[in-house]
Structure formats: C-alpha cells, structure tokens
C-alpha cells in the first residue's frame, strides 16, 4: 500500500497538562474539527471519545493514553492523549518517548500547576519541542499574561506570545494573530463562523508591544533575520513563520496561543499551530539503538530502511484481546509478517494492524515509518520492547520507569477468586510498568504497589469491573528503603566440612555509601578468589540487599568493593561464595550506621486566604517542610515537602479544615532519612 502522506506532512504530537486544564475537551474538539467526530463529546457528561475506560468516564479524568489518527489540511495528525494526574506519570513518560512534539494546555486561571512542572521536566528529558495553548480564556479569573509569566518563572522557558486575547472571562471573543497582525473573531457557538478583521483600536497598543517583542525574540534565533531587523527592515510573514518553526523545533522558543476549547474558540488556530510549528518526523534526530554487537546504530525515518518499531503501551481490549500500541520508526510493519522482538530475543507474528480512533478502529495492511497504530496478536511483547527485522536486528533506547512508592495487601473475597485475581494482576502489571505485584513471603499475602492512592484505587476498581474479582483491601503501606551512612570493611567465611564434599567461600568487602544505583567493583588481585566465583559474591550481596537489617526493607545507595578472600580447591562452589557474599553484606551493614529512608512528596496546596494559618499548622504537624508560598487569584498556594506516611487520608482532612474549598496535588520527590523515633516505631511493627 503506497504511502498516503509524505513524512513531512506527519505530525505525531501529544497533549499534556495538569488535571482539569481541559486536555480531553481540547482533544475532542480537534477530532470534531478534523472531521473524525460527528458529535462533540463532553467530559462533564462522561461522553468523551478519548476517555474510553469506564473509570475514566466516571471520574472525568484521562487514565489510558489512546493514540488517535486524524487529518487536517493535507496533514496526518497522530494525537496521543496523556493523563494529567500525577499517579499516571508512566503514561506520560511512555507517550513522550514516541512523540515528536507536544502541546501543553494551561488553565488560564491557574497558569503553571504542579503536574505541568512534572510533565514539562519529563518532556525536557526527551527534548520534545512544545507550544503552549492557554485554555479556558472564558472562565472567571482567566489571565493570559499571568500564564505567560508563570511559564517563564516556574518552567524557565522562553515563552513567546504569538497571539493575544480579545477580551477575557465572559467577554472573550477571539484573538489577535500577532504574525499576521489581524483580529480573529468567533461569531457562532461551534467556532466555524470566523471573521478576520483589523486589530480593535483599544488593543492596538498592546498588540504592537507584543508583536514587537515576538519579532525580536524570533530574530534573535536567526542571524540573517537579526541583521535585517537591526537595519530596520520589515520582516515578511513567511520569514517569521520559517524562523519560528525552526526555533520551536530547536527548543529555543515556546510559542503561546490562547482559546477556549469548551466554547469552541481557538482550536482550529491551535491545529494550524501544530502543523506550522511542531516537527515532522524528518525534523527531529533519527532514533538510536544498539545492534547485537553492542554498537550504536541510527535508524532514519524512511520506508526503505530496515523495519524498527517500539511497543510503547500494552492494553487489553474486551473485543480483540491484547493490543500493543506501537510506533514504527523506520521501514514498514506488515500484518501477517514475522518480526523479531529483539529485547526478548523471540520471534513474533504480527496478527492484525489497526489504526485507533479513540475507541473505534480501522484495520490496515501495514504501518509505515513514523505511523502509530496497534498490533493484535503479539504473545511476548511488553511495554518498551523493540520489534525489528531478523535480518537487521536493533534494540531501541529503553524507557525508564519510576519504582512504586505505596503498597497495599489485597485478597479475593472468595477462595475461587484467588486464581482469577492472580491472572488479572499479571495482565494489569503487563500494561503498566509502574504497577508491581508480588506475594509477601512472611505473611503469604498478595501485595500490589503503585505510584499513589488513586493509582491503586483504579487497579482495584478494574479488578472488579473488568475481571469480576471482588477484593478486600488492606491499609496502604509506605515503600521504605534502607541505606548506610559510613564506609566500612567486613568479611565472612562460609565453611562446612563434615564428611563428603564440603562447602567453602570466604570474602572481604568494603561497603561505601553513594548517591546512585548499586555498584559492584571487583578489586581482587592475584587470584585470591577465582574469577568464576566473583559473580556469585555479587549475586549474594544483591539478594541480601533486598532485605535490610533495620526492618527488612530494600537497601539502596551503596557500592561494594570486593578486595580479598580465599578459596578451597575442592570445597569451593558458586553457592558457597554466594552465601559468603550475603553474610559479608549483613556484617557490613551492622557496622555502617544503617538508617531507614522514607519517600518524601512534593505537595502543593491551594486554599482561600482565611484558612492559611490552619493549613500551615497542619502541614507542620505532618512533619512537613515549607518550601514557599504564592498567591494566585485570591487563593494562597502553599508548597511543601511532606513524608508520604503523613499524607494518607489528607484529602478528607483538607476538606474538613477548609470547608471543602482547599485542593492539593502531590508527587514523589525524593527519599530522606526517617527521624530516629519513627525508625524505631517502623522497625518495631515490622519485627513483631
């Protein structure tokens, strides 16, 4: 099947935002204007096309990122809808990995909110070019100029307005396009009847001021234009657009536009902005990977290159079973073909290929370079796996996911539900890499762990709804860790020689505190321990580190230097050295000033002025550390770091302290030492 749209006419982009900034509504409107939706879906009535899981429709938030294809003025747009709730950062992370550009939606009343910062940092990590759409311009308290300031201050980004609003709050009628220097006024409810006219007289000065600032910002990114600009020459519309596109793709400028998706104003202009300023697959660096020899290899976005694709999300569909959402980076992926899953080293057959439109699907013969779609029929593929041809194997860069910070015990209400629950949990863990499940060896309970209370609520909800497993749920538990404060040396000898073949392993190690991941250094000289036994010592230490000496929590942030030991010609074995390694680790830990660490959350609380003192007092009583305060639209914003263990049930406490008027958002920030008294309490409970 010949390619319908050339690569330069592709835009693969995501829509990212804080919860409630109007992201799903904005996506709905894009689908409406691009002709893929005949009736507009409203998040308020739970009728939105993008939010296709029942829990999303009930809660009015987007949980699963659905990739949708639509068309606009001769361009193919692939939109990835990403959740704005912090518990679902995994979805954002995985969608950013396969995007070329993004639109950040801000709420005109609030500007940059906590989750906006989180998502922005994630996008920085992948170097994703962005534009900003200031939504809800019709809402009371809307302030476009304040939004731009919050972007500059809190995100340290070079935000440049390319539109300014005409009126705001209930007087919002349209915008001035600063590039063309014309006013765009919306005449009807569906935003189809648009009048283009001169800039209103009362906005002329403001438009001139912002237009001059925009032209200067664009000229600064291009030497030729800068010379013209300094010589006082007029820059043409074409020159400005070309330079703005280049500066946006290079992350030098973040263009800012405005609108009200709910009122159908400004969405078409935003889609034009996506086409004009966000990159095509040819504008961004080609994807990198490693071949089987461990050498770096680059795959250009071209149908003629060997096929390589990344499975960025696994979902279970009630009608067709397992779907693997995939982006093809190079070559062509054909239905019915055999490919190699190079991450797992297994062959897979591509069953059917579908292009998703929110929750309906269109079957296709093939997916070409830069296309996104879902593969049905893959058996062994999980999130982050690479699919490629057997003739030219490659493993594309892996995705990294954070470890869970909260866990709960869960059990089925009936004996018969046990097996069903096991199958369901493993399916859910396949879909979501930040969700983990295991059996507690001591109690025999099934434990589920995730990124926050809402995350686990939704997992339990899905067990009941999709898999028909009724569960009892325990109280949430914090994922503590343990670490050490000082470097120590320790040794251990494991010797058993009583008739027959004995066991002998002996090692000396140094355990050193670090900031990073676990490291193992082999500093053995002169063959004190034979080379084949070194990995056994490492494995013994790794296993022992899963359960520390204070309260049995995993030990992190340390390095081991194995520097001496001894062996026995006959009695030494891998097993003996593994046991010696684990004994040496425990001996070292006992001397190394071990401490308990707890997850600390970054919390942002928004409250009316009159409740401020009460709420700050409450933050302090929760062992919170104040980071700062701002005021926004008559409300006070309190920023603080608070231990996760103190945040359980906070929503209810805040509601009662502020008569339902306070809101908060939190995300995991870092691990920190637990105070001595609490360490003893946690250890006491665990060691009962």
Curated annotation (Swiss-Prot):
Residue ranges of every copy of the tr-type G domain listed in the record: 8-282
Keyword GTP-binding: yes
Keywords (A to Z) from UniProt: Cytoplasm, Elongation factor, GTP-binding, Nucleotide-binding, Protein biosynthesis
Record SUPFAM superfamilies: EF-G C-terminal domain-like, P-loop containing nucleoside triphosphate hydrolases, Ribosomal protein S5 domain 2-like, Translation proteins
Domain of life the protein comes from: Bacteria
GO cellular component: cytoplasm
Stored InterPro entries: EF-G-like_DII, EFG_II, EFG_III, EFG_III/V, EFG_IV, EFG_V, EFG_V-like, G_TR_CS
Pfam families given in the database record: EF-G_D2, EFG_C, EFG_III, EFG_IV, GTP_EFTU
An MF annotation (GO) of this entry: translation elongation factor activity
Gene Ontology annotations of biological process type: ribosome disassembly
UniProt: GTP binding residues: 17-24, 81-85, 135-138
Cellular location(s): Cytoplasm
Role played: Catalyzes the GTP-dependent ribosomal translocation step during translation elongation. During this step, the ribosome changes from the pre-translocational (PRE) to the post-translocational (POST) state as the newly formed A-site-bound peptidyl-tRNA and P-site-bound deacylated tRNA move to the P and E sites, respectively. Catalyzes the coordinated movement of the two tRNA molecules, the mRNA and conformational changes in the ribosome.
Protein family: Belongs to the TRAFAC class translation factor GTPase superfamily. Classic translation factor GTPase family. EF-G/EF-2 subfamily.
Protein name: Elongation factor G
Originating gene: fusA
